[in-house]
Amino acid sequence: MELLQQYLQQQQEELKIQRELHSSGQSQNAYQQQQQLEDDEEYDDDQLPLSPTQTEEFDYDNDYNDEEFYDEDDDFKEDDDEEEEEEDDEMYPIRQDNNIDDDDYEEDEEEQLLYPTNNNNNTTTTTPYTTYNNNNNNDINNNNNNNTKSEMTMIPTVSSNISLNPLQILEQYLNTQQQIQQKQFQKHQEELQIQQLQQNHPLQLLEQYLQQQQQIQQEQFFNHQRENQVPNSNSNSLNSSNENNNNNVNNNNNIINNNNNSINNNMNNSNNNNNNNNNGNKNPFFLDDFIYI
């Protein structure tokens, strides 16, 4: 047991020593990192990169105190203005001045390769943007020495060949929609004309008449079916009334036939009388004529 306790105490002491070493190592590493960062900052302040236009190292503490960088009103002179213009040209390489020398073109040859331009009549196209110039860009491309700067407007291109502004795109869309509506209206008018012609066609009129007659016949048939579905008493009364009506009709027909027979008899009698009269009058006249002659 004593050996075990001694062994455990040794292990605990070793763990304490390792923890102390580990904590001291971390603090030492943090101190070294902080020291390295401070050294790097000091090195960066001492080793600032030179600008392309500088030939010697710039002293930020002393050079701005020189009188040549200040005028009477404590403003920067033309050198600072030129530097600002160069920075603007680097930020906006598409913008060009009208008064550019040939030397500037030679210096900016790499920029021209990075930003190619297509020369049209009144537009200068680049990728992915198109620049519209209010003046004639041919003056810029031909290096005319004008003292005015071209005013550029950046808008996205519609296609690689044709450049349109948003108003032109909207106008084209409205024109296409108007054409589609006109075609639909014309088609609708043609369909209406065809329907009117079909309705006024004689065959169509005949078909309508036949349909109406068919409806009338169907209604009559249904009415007749309803009448046949009446109870027996009513049907007997109807049959008796129909028989009486038929008898009356037959009697009337007999009367008419009798009248016709009487008329025929009268006509025959009148014809016989006329014949008798004609035969009785002929002999005396002939005898008299014969006697007188």
UniProtKB/Swiss-Prot annotation:
Residues 117-148, 232-283 have a biased composition (Low complexity). Residues 37-47, 56-91, 99-112 have a biased composition (Acidic residues). GO terms for molecular function: histone acetyltransferase activity. Residues 20-148, 226-283 are annotated as: Disordered. This is Putative uncharacterized protein DDB_G0272194.
